Amino acid sequence: EHKKILTADKHKIPGLRNLSHFTPMAPGVPVPLHYHSDIIELHFMVKGQRKTYVMKGGVRTSYCATGNNLFITRPYELHTTGHIAQNRCEFFAMQLDLKEHDNFLGLNQHYSNILCHRLLNMDQHLYHVGSSQISMLRTAFNLISYGTEGDSIAGVQYLTCVLASLNYLTAVPAQEEINEQLNSDIGHALKYIEQNIE
């Protein structure tokens, strides 16, 4: 299986919706345009590359995350991977529910609020992430996936360390972001042709 998803009803960790690991066995299925209310979505790229498009005011901005990059979408932010299947890549993804801001990851109210505030104030979409953070995230995922209470407690500690370190990350310098007005089906057709005909 090229993906493993740990859902909130299984892991029961406050503030963590889904925690997923996608391996590079098969290209990803295109993700349609959508948003999440009260949820920050994080994609930690291990290897390969993954494009995501963020929509704002009828303008689509393209971001390309590669190995050791973190891509973030914020609550109510429209995003998609486009109409074309993604390249093979490995990444961890998580959805953080900020409605749990008083008990986020089981932290007390004070620290929970601080961590949620820090996450909401990350103002870029793309950041460099260290291999130690990826390693801690992999450990967190493995421990939480075992399903025992003791393993979950240890896994949450690793996950909390990763999330608490994110506000120290350096943003990826502005790429050649593609800003396009989305008012024409012809534009979509031309873009598809340009990307798929050699």
Language-model features: locations:
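Amphipathic, well-ordered alpha-helical segments in soluble domains
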Residues: 41-44, 133-140, 158, 162-165
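A general marker of short, structured functional hotspots
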Residues: 18, 31-32, 39, 123, ...
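Polar low-complexity intrinsically disordered regions
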Residues: 1, 59-60, 176-180
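N-terminal regulatory/effector-sensing and dimerization cores
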Residues: 21-117, 151-152
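Intrinsic-disorder/low-complexity regions
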Residues: 8, 67-68, 184, 195
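Short, Lys/Arg-enriched, Trp-marked, Pro/Gly-tolerant hinge/linker segments that flank
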Residues: 120-131, 145-159, 163-198
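A hydrophobic/aromatic-rich effector-binding and dimerization subdomain
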Residues: 1-22, 78-149, 168-172
